[in-house]
Curated annotation (Swiss-Prot):
Entries under CDD domains matching the protein: ABC_NrtD_SsuB_transporters (cd03293)
Record GO cellular component, one term: plasma membrane
Annotated function: Part of the ABC transporter complex TauABC involved in taurine import. Responsible for energy coupling to the transport system.
Reactions listed under catalytic activity: taurine(out) + ATP + H2O = taurine(in) + ADP + phosphate + H(+)
Quaternary structure, from the entry: The complex is composed of two ATP-binding proteins (TauB), two transmembrane proteins (TauC) and a solute-binding protein (TauA).
E.C. no: 7.6.2.7
Pfam family, one: ABC_tran
Localization, UniProt: Cell inner membrane
Keywords, ordered alphabetically: ATP-binding, Cell inner membrane, Cell membrane, Membrane, Nucleotide-binding, Translocase, Transport
Name of the protein this chain belongs to: Taurine import ATP-binding protein TauB
Length: 263
């Protein structure tokens, strides 16, 4: 089974004449079929870690590998979805999805067929000819997911993809993401600062603090697998264990915040 790993990653940059560490000797990994969610406050280094996994940034030390092969730069085995969807506003939904396939050299008929297939997967088949400006926030994020899925990556890297959505749309997108995960068997790497989102979407949850980024806690979570096995969202979120873990994580964040304030 394909596995994406970050090994002993460190990154720093110059600030006012001094080196400031963002990541220091950080290691983690996930396999296809897993959902690794990184939970942490803003500014702790989560997005930097995702950018390194995606190949957008190069670490000062350490390496990113898939199955022992060191990666340099972006690649088709990793699809990326951002909070800012970065869609091409002058293209319609279908052409936004097909663009990445065109860059990879697929012929027009093949890329159009593939684009329509993934639009159907995310429930946008009826909006293929719509311009991006005519789509709602939730539809734009669905389109961002479709574009990432079109190139058939092994791993989806998602940087707070639902953070700008209203609460109801956000919950619907979380359910859609788990449906896609169940159907495709992709590995998910998602970063968030929402405790509820992390608990619902993760098979493995990493709590991060920083900078420099450090892993405070790692814990296996089974709510995503329970949803994939057919349990309802209402049943999962009303489970006392969900509430217990939610409160424990919130308490942990409060402890960290109070410790920082004391200093």
């Amino acid at each position: 089974m394909s596995r994406l790993t970050a090994e002993a990653i460190s990154l720093s940059f110059e600030q006012r004449g001094q080196r400031r560490a963002i990541l220091r000797d950080l290691s983690l990994g996930l396999a296809k079929g897993e959902s690794l969610v990184v939970l942490g406050p803003s500014g702790c280094g989560k997005s930097t870690l995702l950018n390194i996994l995606a190949g957008f940034q190069t670490p000062d030390q350490g390496r990113v590998q898939i199955d022992g092969r060191t990666l340099e730069g972006p690649g088709g085995e990793r699809g990326v979805v951002f909070q800012d969807d970065a869609l091409m506003p002058w293209l319609n939904a279908l052409d936004n999805v097909a663009l990445g396939l065109r860059i990879r050299g697929l012929g027009k008929a093949e890329r159009t067929a593939r684009a329509r297939q993934v639009l159907q997967l995310v429930g946008l088949q009826e909006y293929a000819e719509q311009s991006v400006a005519e789509l709602s926030g939730g539809q734009r994020q669905r389109l961002g997911l479709a574009r990432a899925l079109a190139v058939e990556p092994d791993f989806l890297l998602l940087d707070e993809p639902f953070g700008a959505l209203d609460a109801l749309t956000r919950e619907r997108m979380q359910v859609l993401l788990l449906d896609l995960w169940k159907q495709t068997g992709k590995g998910l790497f998602l970063i968030t600062h929402s405790v509820d989102e992390a608990l619902f979407l993760a098979t493995d949850l990493v709590v991060m603090d920083g900078p420099p980024a450090r892993i405070v806690k790692r814990l296996p979570v089974d709510f995503a697998r329970r949803y994939a096995a057919g349990e309802t969202v209402r049943s999962i979120k009303s489970d006392p264990e969900f509430g217990r873990l939610r409160q424990a994580l919130l308490d942990e964040f409060l402890d960290v915040a109070e410790a920082e304030h004391a200093h």
